[in-house]
């Protein structure tokens, strides 16, 4: 590259027009999808990759401007997380390097993990949107049939601006400890009889195995995975061990693939 011959062109109108056009086309292509995953954390990204890799049209919505959830900070700011077998296989599939830790654990870089999980989901065909908050669901004829969305910046500013919607065959609540989608459904529709107990304190073994047990279809059309599954069933938290989160993402993907196959 001969830098002396470079003359960069950037017409202001062309920049704006290009962005608006691409944004319009993107939304037109994603207003109706097979699966909406709310939350781009460990389990959400894992589920998105497996679903997209199987040819499912997947949209992952993350309210923050970066995906990965709490993985980036590792354990108390130390730049590593731990996983157990067989979750190490899920990370290895996207080229994440693992080192042996204590008592059968594997150690992974807390920046490399979300970066490669995210690009893995995108490369598989999932669409990831950041800065979008899901504030409600579409509830029609006793089934969750999509999500109600808004800009997270608008939401944080407290502005009264009406939301828009995305239709989906299935919605996954992968919002972590808050289980915000499930909680909103229960709070706004008391007649459904949904009770969300919230998560318990930390017990790593029980928390990890709870993720596998509680990953399920919580309500017709609404699945829970990752910490949202424990929060909706009164399970324990587990700290900076993530194996159950990744396996939970694969479990929910397999459940939905089976549903789609039988439609």
UniProtKB/Swiss-Prot annotation:
It is an enzyme of class 2 (transferase). Its EC number is 2.4.2.59. Its cofactor is Fe(2+). The keyword Transferase applies. It catalyses: hydrogen sulfide + glycine + NAD(+) = ADP-5-ethyl-4-methylthiazole-2-carboxylate + nicotinamide + 3 H2O + H(+). Pfam families: Thi4 (PF01946). Keywords: Iron, Metal-binding, NAD, Thiamine biosynthesis, Transferase. It comes from the Archaea. GO terms for biological process: thiamine biosynthetic process; thiamine diphosphate biosynthetic process; thiazole biosynthetic process. One of its GO terms (molecular function) is pentosyltransferase activity. SUPFAM superfamilies: FAD/NAD(P)-binding domain. Glycine binds at residue 237. Fe cation binds at residues 162, 177. NAD(+) binds at residues 43, 62-63, 70, 134, 160-162, 180, 227. Disulfide bonds: none annotated. Pathway: Cofactor biosynthesis; thiamine diphosphate biosynthesis. Belongs to the THI4 family. Involved in the biosynthesis of the thiazole moiety of thiamine. Catalyzes the conversion of NAD and glycine to adenosine diphosphate 5-(2-hydroxyethyl)-4-methylthiazole-2-carboxylate (ADT), an adenylated thiazole intermediate, using free sulfide as a source of sulfur. Homooctamer; tetramer of dimers. This is Thiamine thiazole synthase.
């Amino acid at each position: 590259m001969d830098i002396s011959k470079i003359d960069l062109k950037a017409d202001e109108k062309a920049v704006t027009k290009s962005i608006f056009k691409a944004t319009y086309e993107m939304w037109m292509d994603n207003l109706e999808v097979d699966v909406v995953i709310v939350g781009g954390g460990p389990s959400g990204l894992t589920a998105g990759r497996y679903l997209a890799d199987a040819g499912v049209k997947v949209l992952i919505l993350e309210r923050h401007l970066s995906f990965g959830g709490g993985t980036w900070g590792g354990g108390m700011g130390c730049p590593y997380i731990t996983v157990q077998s067989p979750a190490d296989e899920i990370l290895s599939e996207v080229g994440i390097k693992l080192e042996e830790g204590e008592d059968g654990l594997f150690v992974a870089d807390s920046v490399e993990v979300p970066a490669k999980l995210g690009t893995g989901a995108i490369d598989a065909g999932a669409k990831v949107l950041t800065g979008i908050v899901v504030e409600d669901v579409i509830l029609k004829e006793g089934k969750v049939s999509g999500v109600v969305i808004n800009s997270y910046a608008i939401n944080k500013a407290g502005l009264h601006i009406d939301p828009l919607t995305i239709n989906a065959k299935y919605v996954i609540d992968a919002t972590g400890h808050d289980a915000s989608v499930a909680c909103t459904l229960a709070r706004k529709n008391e007649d459904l009889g949904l009770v969300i107990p919230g998560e318990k304190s930390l017990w790593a073994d029980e928390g990890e195995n709870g993720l596998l047990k509680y990953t399920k279809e919580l309500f017709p059309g609404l699945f829970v995975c990752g910490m949202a599954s424990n929060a909706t069933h009164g399970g324990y938290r587990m700290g900076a061990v993530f194996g159950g989160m990744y396996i939970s993402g694969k479990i929910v993907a397999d459940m939905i693939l089976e549903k789609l196959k039988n439609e």
